[in-house]
């Protein structure tokens, strides 16, 4: 299987992956258009496109509210809705098509099939939980809950690191494996014409399975984000 490379651009010491940037902007655009389209001319009795939006919204609220609590849920409901939609689209983009030039430059893929991208997403989630902890409870109380008693500090640091790493590796492993398998099945169809029906059927079945797994991973990522955030902002006052 030929190795593909993503186009990059450097601005000083900073290197930007153009494929990842393009895919991210595309995802944000799709989410914006979907929410704008589905929320236009809303009525008290939902119908059609409004039903779709409300179903997705209720679904996301249903599995995140137990972790955040009703007290704070209204402040984070849109965040979790957008996060879930972002992860669903990001995980499935690479299954839709391939856009690669003759020299191996890749212009289309799931951004979550890139480990650096997933590590960045995971880091932002962990950073968000700490920022919200400080904003909700104050810097002093947040630090105290993290460092008291003193002997648990190493365990707290290890917990934060494992949360960060597991969140990234889980999504990367599943999405990357799905794209690799899809590429292998596509290559199989190029070996001989009699392999084409087999490769087509196998790829169709694998794509359906990958879409299911991708949606499950989006659910898990959003769920764990709500768990981590809830643990930071719902600590009982002493």
From Swiss-Prot:
The entry's keywords: Antibiotic resistance, ATP synthesis, Cell membrane, CF(0), Hydrogen ion transport, Ion transport, Membrane, Transmembrane, Transmembrane helix, Transport
Predominant location: membrane
Transmembrane feature ranges: 15-35, 76-96, 111-131, 167-187, 208-230
Keyword Membrane: yes
Classification via SUPFAM superfamilies: F1F0 ATP synthase subunit A
Keyword Aminoacyl-tRNA synthetase attached: no
Entry membrane topology: Multi-pass membrane protein
One cellular component term from this protein's GO annotations in UniProt: proton-transporting ATP synthase complex
InterPro entries referenced in this protein's UniProt entry, alphabetically: ATP_syn_F0_a_bact/chloroplast, ATP_synth_F0_asu, F0_ATP_A_sf
A Pfam short name: ATP-synt_A
One GO biological process term: proton motive force-driven plasma membrane ATP synthesis
Up-regulation conditions: Induced by a decrease in external pH from 7.5 to 5.7.
Location in or out of the cell: Cell membrane
Molecular function (Gene Ontology), one example: proton-transporting ATP synthase activity, rotational mechanism
Domain of life: Bacteria
Functional note: Key component of the proton channel; it plays a direct role in the translocation of protons across the membrane.
Record-linked PANTHER family: ATP SYNTHASE SUBUNIT A, CHLOROPLASTIC
Subunit structure: F-type ATPases have 2 components, CF(1) - the catalytic core - and CF(0) - the membrane proton channel. CF(1) has five subunits: alpha(3), beta(3), gamma(1), delta(1), epsilon(1). CF(0) has three main subunits: a(1), b(2) and c(9-12). The alpha and beta chains form an alternating ring which encloses part of the gamma chain. CF(1) is attached to CF(0) by a central stalk formed by the gamma and epsilon chains, while a peripheral stalk is formed by the delta and b chains.
Record-stated family: Belongs to the ATPase A chain family.
Protein's name according to its UniProt entry: ATP synthase subunit a
Organism: Streptococcus pneumoniae (strain ATCC BAA-255 / R6)
């Amino acid at each position: 299987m030929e190795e593909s490379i993503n186009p990059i651009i450097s601005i000083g010491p900073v290197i930007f992956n153009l494929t990842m940037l393009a895919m991210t902007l595309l995802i944000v655009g799709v989410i914006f258009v979907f929410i704008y389209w589905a929320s236009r001319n809303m009525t008290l009795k939902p119908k059609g496109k409004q039903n779709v939006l409300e179903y997705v919204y209720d679904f996301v609220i249903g599995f995140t509210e137990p972790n955040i609590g009703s007290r704070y849920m209204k402040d984070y409901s849109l965040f979790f809705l957008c996060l879930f939609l972002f992860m669903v689209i990001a995980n499935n983009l690479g299954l839709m098509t391939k856009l690669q030039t003759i020299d191996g430059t890749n212009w289309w893929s799931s951004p979550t099939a890139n480990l650096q991208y997933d590590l960045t997403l995971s880091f932002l989630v962990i950073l968000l939980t700490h920022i919200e902890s400080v904003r909700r409870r104050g810097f002093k109380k947040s630090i105290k809950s993290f460092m008291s008693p003193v002997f648990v500090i190493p365990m707290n640091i290890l917990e934060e690191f494992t949360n960060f790493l597991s969140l990234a590796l889980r999504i990367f492993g599943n999405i990357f494996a799905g794209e690799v398998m899809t590429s292998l099945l596509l290559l199989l169809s190029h070996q001989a014409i009699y392999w084409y029906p087999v490769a087509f059927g196998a790829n169709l079945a694998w794509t359906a399975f990958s879409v299911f797994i991708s949606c499950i991973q989006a659910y898990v990522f959003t769920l764990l984000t709500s768990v981590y955030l809830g643990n930071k902002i719902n600590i009982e006052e002493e």
